[in-house]
């Protein structure tokens, strides 16, 4: 898991997320939309780690207990939502891993962050189950929906989530310049 400073490109998105943290204006739900392998998971993990960071100044600090736990994928308040079926995130996945869990306050952090990778695989029932939570979230909840196709979401989900910017693949000259 990397911090924001380890991510090449996506400066506008990183700036938006850092600004939300600095101004204490973190939304309850974000959609990270972009092509496969465009860095959505890396950015989501860096954002989740920054939200949980106990350090001062630039976050994530990568030195505090919470950051170290996040790097090891062992931070109890960063939850990766999984799914049993390979091509579908069903209503039971959302209910058991988000809706039933979100009522429990964070264990050791200010926020409880849920990362849903391949969120476009949520069927309509799963989206409707998630919608209720997105409409009335606890103050400590942040849900990150990572997708290659935001158009697959119900319009009501799209209207209640922040989409900082769509992700794109980096151009070769951007990557080479940073290497």
PLM-predicted stretches and their roles:
Residues 2-125:
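Clamp-loader machinery-focused feature within the broader ASCE/P-loop NTPase space
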Residues 110-113, 139-143:
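Loop/turn-to-beta-strand initiation segments
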Residues 118, 126, 141, 149-153, ...:
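Helical "lid/switch" subdomain of P-loop NTPase nucleotide-binding domains
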Residues 121, 136, 152, 163:
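Residues immediately C-terminal
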Residues 128-139:
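Conserved catalytic/switch belt of AAA+ P-loop NTPases
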Residues 146:
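Conserved D-loop beta-strand region of ABC ATPase nucleotide-binding domains
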Residues 156-166:
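A short helix-turn-beta junction within AAA+ P-loop NTPase domains corresponding to the substrate/partner-engaging
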Residues 169-172, 176-179:
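Single conserved hydrophobic/aromatic residue that forms the stacking wall/gate
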């Amino acid at each position: 898991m990397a911090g924001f400073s380890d991510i090449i490109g996506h400066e506008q998105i990183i700036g938006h997320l850092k600004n939300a943290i600095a101004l204490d204006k973190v939304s309850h739900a974000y959609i990270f939309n972009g092509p496969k392998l465009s860095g959505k998971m890396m950015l989501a993990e860096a954002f989740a780690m920054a939200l949980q960071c106990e350090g001062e100044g630039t976050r994530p600090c990568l030195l505090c207990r919470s950051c170290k736990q996040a790097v090891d994928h062992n931070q109890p308040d960063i939850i990766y939502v999984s799914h049993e079926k390979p091509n579908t995130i069903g209503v039971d996945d959302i209910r058991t891993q988000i809706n039933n869990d979100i009522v429990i306050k964070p264990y050791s952090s200010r926020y409880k962050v849920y990362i849903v990778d391949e969120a476009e695989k949520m069927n309509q029932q799963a989206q409707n189950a998630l919608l209720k939570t997105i409409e009335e979230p606890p103050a400590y909840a942040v849900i990150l929906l990572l997708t290659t196709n935001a158009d697959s979401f119900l319009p009501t989900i799209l209207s209640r989530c922040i989409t900082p910017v769509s992700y794109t693949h980096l151009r070769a000259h951007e990557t080479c310049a940073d290497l």
